[in-house]
A protein has these predicted regions:
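Conserved AMP-binding/adenylation subdomain of ANL enzymes
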Residues: 19-42, 50-90, 105
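Adenylate-forming
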Residues: 12-16, 26-33, 43, 81-83, ...
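Short, well-ordered beta-strand segments
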Residues: 42-44, 122
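Short beta->alpha linker loops
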Residues: 75-76, 97, 127
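Conserved AMP-binding A3 loop
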Residues: 1-25
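Gly/Ser/Thr-rich phosphate-binding loop
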Residues: 2-6, 64, 90-94, 105-167
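Short Gly/Pro-enriched turn/cap motifs at secondary-structure boundaries
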Residues: 169-175
Length: 178
């Protein structure tokens, strides 16, 4: 049982069908091509694992052999920046609200932390306001990626920063095998 985020009301429990071994291999290959998860990479999971996206992302990070995973007991924008610097985090999955809260930090607070280790940041769970996404790309570089999906089916489309900059408002291309 995995729970929805509650965007349409209270979180709802959803049963997902398990894939066959071949289906799971294809899924892992597709996700790895998009997310570049694997050995030598380090991540922080700043969201609760009882929600679909962080739960699935965490499992994929383990299955794909990521070197380090840091779990945050609760999201705090400055704490996330501190942890990125401390652990030299390469990968991060967020939601737009986390971007908004980080951007609300005073500029001098944001500038205290070195986040240049980040190679790949992906957000999901809700549409990201275009001005917020642009500010994140300006701050962290063109490493901000986005996917759309649903608890019931997982990720279905993917969009990187360059695609978004060229086609604002796009939800990206359909992901194969998803």
């Amino acid at each position: 049982m995995i729970y929805t985020s509650g965007t349409t009301g209270r979180p709802k429990g959803v049963r997902r069908k398990s894939g066959t071994p071949d289906e799971m291999d294809n899924l892992y290959e597709t996700i790895n091509q998009a997310f570049d998860i694997g050995p030598g990479k380090r991540t922080i999971i700043p969201a609760p694992l009882y929600h679909s996206a962080p739960n699935t992302y965490g499992i994929l990070c383990v299955v794909m052999g990521m070197d380090e995973m840091v779990l945050m007991p609760r999201f705090d924008p400055e704490d996330l920046l501190r942890l990125i610097e401390k652990h030299k985090t390469t990968h991060l999955q967020t939601v737009p609200t986390m971007f908004i809260r980080m951007l609300k930090l005073p500029e001098e607070e944001r500038a205290k932390y070195i986040v240049s280790s980040l190679e790949f940041v992906v957000h999901a769970a809700a549409p990201c306001p275009p001005d917020i996404k642009q500010q994140m790309i300006d701050w962290w570089g063109p490493i901000i990626n986005e996917y759309y999906g649903a608890t019931e089916v997982g990720a279905v489309s993917f969009l990187d920063s360059n695609q978004w900059l060229g086609h604002r408002g796009s939800v990206g291309e359909a992901m194969k095998n998803c």
